[in-house]
Amino acid sequence: MDPVDPNIEPWNQPGSQPKTACNQCYCKRCCYHCQICFLKKGLGISNGRKKRRPRRTTPYNSENHQDPLRKQPLSQPRGEQTDPKESKKKVESKTKTDQFD
């Protein structure tokens, strides 16, 4: 093994770079050419632009958006339960009797 010179940066040490340049070949020998070739060719990892994937959305369900702990009771009307026509008749009869007072 070559002696390591502390005065030279690690990337400039002898044997730190391959003697041949990287190429576009994907054969086994070229895939193991250097660490960069192994990552790009062997593992298929590149730092290029990544494709944008659409988000997965769940189908809209109104039950998903409600509070499951509290179910509020239906509002109960207060007072007498009467038909609207009957209530109009009562109001008319009251107004007629009040007019004579």
Swiss-Prot record:
<keyword id="KW-0007">Acetylation</keyword>
<keyword id="KW-1122">Modulation of host chromatin by virus</keyword>
<feature type="modified residue" description="Asymmetric dimethylarginine; by host PRMT6">
    <location>
        <position position="52"/>
    </location>
</feature>
<dbReference type="GO" id="GO:0006351">
    <property type="term" value="P:DNA-templated transcription"/>
</dbReference>
<keyword id="KW-0922">Interferon antiviral system evasion</keyword>
<feature type="region of interest" description="Disordered">
    <location>
        <begin position="45"/>
        <end position="101"/>
    </location>
</feature>
<dbReference type="GO" id="GO:0039525">
    <property type="term" value="P:symbiont-mediated perturbation of host chromatin organization"/>
</dbReference>
<keyword id="KW-0053">Apoptosis</keyword>
<comment type="function">
    <text>Extracellular circulating Tat can be endocytosed by surrounding uninfected cells via the binding to several surface receptors such as CD26, CXCR4, heparan sulfate proteoglycans (HSPG) or LDLR. Neurons are rarely infected, but they internalize Tat via their LDLR. Through its interaction with nuclear HATs, Tat is potentially able to control the acetylation-dependent cellular gene expression. Modulates the expression of many cellular genes involved in cell survival, proliferation or in coding for cytokines or cytokine receptors. Tat plays a role in T-cell and neurons apoptosis.</text>
</comment>
<keyword id="KW-0014">AIDS</keyword>
<feature type="binding site">
    <location>
        <position position="37"/>
    </location>
    <ligand>
        <name>Zn(2+) 1</name>
    </ligand>
</feature>
<keyword id="KW-0899">Viral immunoevasion</keyword>
<dbReference type="GO" id="GO:0050434">
    <property type="term" value="P:positive regulation of viral transcription"/>
</dbReference>
<keyword id="KW-0805">Transcription regulation</keyword>
<keyword id="KW-1090">Inhibition of host innate immune response by virus</keyword>
<keyword id="KW-0479">Metal-binding</keyword>
<comment type="function">
    <text>Transcriptional activator that increases RNA Pol II processivity, thereby increasing the level of full-length viral transcripts. Recognizes a hairpin structure at the 5'-LTR of the nascent viral mRNAs referred to as the transactivation responsive RNA element (TAR) and recruits the cyclin T1-CDK9 complex (P-TEFb complex) that will in turn hyperphosphorylate the RNA polymerase II to allow efficient elongation. The CDK9 component of P-TEFb and other Tat-activated kinases hyperphosphorylate the C-terminus of RNA Pol II that becomes stabilized and much more processive.</text>
</comment>
<dbReference type="GO" id="GO:0046872">
    <property type="term" value="F:metal ion binding"/>
</dbReference>
<protein>
    <recommendedName>
        <fullName>Protein Tat</fullName>
    </recommendedName>
</protein>
<dbReference type="GO" id="GO:0030430">
    <property type="term" value="C:host cell cytoplasm"/>
</dbReference>
<feature type="site" description="Essential for Tat translocation through the endosomal membrane">
    <location>
        <position position="11"/>
    </location>
</feature>
<keyword id="KW-0964">Secreted</keyword>
<dbReference type="Pfam" id="PF00539">
    <property type="entry name" value="Tat"/>
</dbReference>
<feature type="binding site">
    <location>
        <position position="25"/>
    </location>
    <ligand>
        <name>Zn(2+) 2</name>
    </ligand>
</feature>
<keyword id="KW-1035">Host cytoplasm</keyword>
<keyword id="KW-1017">Isopeptide bond</keyword>
<dbReference type="InterPro" id="IPR036963">
    <property type="entry name" value="Tat_dom_sf"/>
</dbReference>
<dbReference type="InterPro" id="IPR001831">
    <property type="entry name" value="IV_Tat"/>
</dbReference>
<feature type="binding site">
    <location>
        <position position="33"/>
    </location>
    <ligand>
        <name>Zn(2+) 1</name>
    </ligand>
</feature>
<feature type="modified residue" description="N6-acetyllysine; by host PCAF">
    <location>
        <position position="28"/>
    </location>
</feature>
<feature type="binding site">
    <location>
        <position position="22"/>
    </location>
    <ligand>
        <name>Zn(2+) 1</name>
    </ligand>
</feature>
<dbReference type="GO" id="GO:0039606">
    <property type="term" value="P:symbiont-mediated suppression of host translation initiation"/>
</dbReference>
<keyword id="KW-0597">Phosphoprotein</keyword>
<feature type="region of interest" description="Cysteine-rich">
    <location>
        <begin position="22"/>
        <end position="37"/>
    </location>
</feature>
<keyword id="KW-0804">Transcription</keyword>
<feature type="short sequence motif" description="Nuclear localization signal, RNA-binding (TAR), and protein transduction">
    <location>
        <begin position="49"/>
        <end position="57"/>
    </location>
</feature>
<comment type="similarity">
    <text>Belongs to the lentiviruses Tat family.</text>
</comment>
<feature type="compositionally biased region" description="Basic and acidic residues">
    <location>
        <begin position="80"/>
        <end position="101"/>
    </location>
</feature>
<feature type="binding site">
    <location>
        <position position="34"/>
    </location>
    <ligand>
        <name>Zn(2+) 1</name>
    </ligand>
</feature>
<feature type="region of interest" description="Interaction with the host capping enzyme RNGTT">
    <location>
        <begin position="49"/>
        <end position="86"/>
    </location>
</feature>
<keyword id="KW-0945">Host-virus interaction</keyword>
<dbReference type="GO" id="GO:0030332">
    <property type="term" value="F:cyclin binding"/>
</dbReference>
